[in-house]
Amino acid sequence: AANEGNAVGIAAGYYFSTNRVPLVYMQNSGMGNAFNPIVSLADKNVYSVPLVLLIGWRGEPGTNDWPQHRTQGAVTDKLLEMLDIPFAAAEDNDDLMEARIQWAVRLARTRRGPVAVIAGKGVFAGGKKTSVLSGRYPMSREEAIEIILDTLPEHTIYVATTGRATRELYFLRERRKEGHGHDFLNVGAMGHASS
């Protein structure tokens, strides 16, 4: 999906065609993108789509996170409450997490609307990370950014999206002893840098 709102729309289509409860995973910074189709499509007062939202909780109160996540983190649970979306915390024990997802699926079916499970910092950090992309691409993101810097005219304005691309552009400029005057390092608004 292009963004979280698209994911909710795709999930609704999945439900309409299979009668199975879909799960949409998103970071809480994507909740704003998801809310329009949640309240105007999936809501129990519209098309009653039982939907499980698994939401990564960046900026959770009491945790140390980047500034762009703090406000969203502080209001994540409040936004779900305002939209009358029941929610519970994710568990970092596999058996408990399976039970939590089963709870969410049952409740989504019963209430015929969205239910959320919020995953705080570190909940999914216990296992070994594996890359599904390892070896598929001959060039790293940093190498691609450096080629772009080498190729485009000196006064080109660069807009870098949130996350690693922003950091890599910043540190490449530092390493190359170049200024940042033509760089917009977008640390928030995930998925909207090209707008």
Question: What are these model-predicted stretches?
Answer:
Residues 1-194:
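Thiamine diphosphate
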